[in-house]
Amino acid sequence: MGRIIRVTGPLVVADDMKGAKMYEVVRVGEMGLIGEIIRLEGDKAVIQVYEETAGIRPGEPVEGTGASLSVELGPGLLTAMYDGIQRPLEVLRELSGDFIARGLTAPALPRDKKWHFTPKVKVGDKVVGGDILGVVPETGIIEHRVLVPPWVEGEIVEIVEEGDYTIEEVIAKVKKPNGEIEELKMYHRWPVRVKRPYKRKLPPEVPLITGQRTIDTFFSQAKGGTAAIPGPFGSGKTVTQHQLAKWSDAQVVVYIGCGERGNEMTDVLEEFPKLKDPKTGKPLMERTVLIANTSNMPVAAREASIYTGITIAEYFRDMGYDVALMADSTSRWAEALREISGRLEEMPGEEGYPAYLASKIAEFYERAGRVITLGSDERIGSVSVIGAVSPPGGDFSEPVVQNTLRVVKVFWALDADLARRRHFPAINWLRSYSLYIDSIQDWWHKNVDPEWRAMRDRAMELLQKEAELQEIVRIVGPDALPDREKAVLIVARMLREDYLQQDAFDEVDTYCPPKKQVTMMRVILNFYERTMEAVDRGVPVDEIAKLPVREKIGRMKFEPEIEKVAALIDETNAQFEELFKKYGA
């Protein structure tokens, strides 16, 4: 027990805190607000409070809980919506109405709900941390694998029969090597600032297929990879994040709304239950965990929400699932660090951010990865992290963007210019990059098309050539260009408008499978080759631009059947042959 001696915003200083530990959770004041000790000096503790501190005064008590900030991991996480410190918002609403009262807590996982548990081990089996004790069908899409906590190993001396149990009931007893008996329930707690252990990391060789053509073809994300989406306001960060949350081929999605508008979380809540998972036909919400920490919630909890989210993601990874984590936006998290650092009177670094900003960002992103999980069987799981960054005024030289780019391997640069021209996703193909292309090309060649890399590089060259020609056109106008270069402009425009542009609100175009992406690319590149051949044979460029097949190529993105898209190649060839006859070429 201690007493408050000073309150500054979300920061409270208390004395008489003998026996307190770093990162211990405490209850502050008469209301019992939740806080966390972030600095100890003698018997004084500096506490960051995760709730509004108005009305708290010196002299009020501070009570330690003896535990660090932890999350509950077990059945009931999926479809749930939490705040930054894993309080279930639906339950809090029942307790206090639409606005959360202060000092409220509720268990993160439902205590009274019964889950159907099927054991996978028997008495006498030797188990280690990470082994699967049994399974629970948590939603129609995901089977929840109940794991032995990482710190437990020994022999099973008792395991329950198949049946319905709450998460508080003991389902197994393990005799440890020292003879102690450890009781296991369906859930366990894990401190959020500690990364969950695994056997070893694997190289990122499998792409995370998102169904967004720009991303999959040009700037691919790998399973277990890290990506950043920086962009100015209104350039489509949140919609891109939503698209990735909807369509990426991860089995579980953790969506952290960190310091963004409340309406954006409402969007997710309204859309996801209606949307069907393309693989199973069940609502997408059944594979999603939402962490809502909107801009009008206390600043300190933003910092916690990022860690809460990644810990939940690591837990599903340990079951052997591929998890995608969306953090929207890491800038707001960095601003929370800046505010708390300022209250602590630390030396500011660049633009007032704390000097340790770079290491905090790196610490978060390095928890991503594709790994062989703990346990006797060789399960492979992955956490792919995609962080949005909102630099003020779209300035990419700002510290959060620069420190993020040092650690992530994929950079999707959103461009306000493209967004103004209604080119979505507004990913600038000249500034963006992916360092995973070399490691994932084998997957594409084996599973989709052996010519994928060659076609991708060819298309990229065309887009870069177009950018060079655009500068000349601005100075001397398009008529001064030779025919071959005019042809490049025509085909590059087709690439931009018919391939890169995608409609997130169209039923067909919102998700483009890899096979269709490659076929569309082949149609456009075939048109390019025939165009060059025609120009060399003396066919005027204006005639090529008027070919009726161009309109069909423009509409192919809305065509669900891949065969019909592939048929455009023959149609293109036939129309060019007619041109050759007409011009006697």
From Swiss-Prot:
GO terms for cellular component: plasma membrane; proton-transporting two-sector ATPase complex, catalytic domain. Has multiple subunits with at least A(3), B(3), C, D, E, F, H, I and proteolipid K(x). Its main location: membrane. It comes from Thermococcus onnurineus (strain NA1). This is A-type ATP synthase subunit A. Its EC number is 7.1.2.2. It is an enzyme of class 7 (translocase). It catalyses: ATP + H2O + 4 H(+)(in) = ADP + phosphate + 5 H(+)(out).
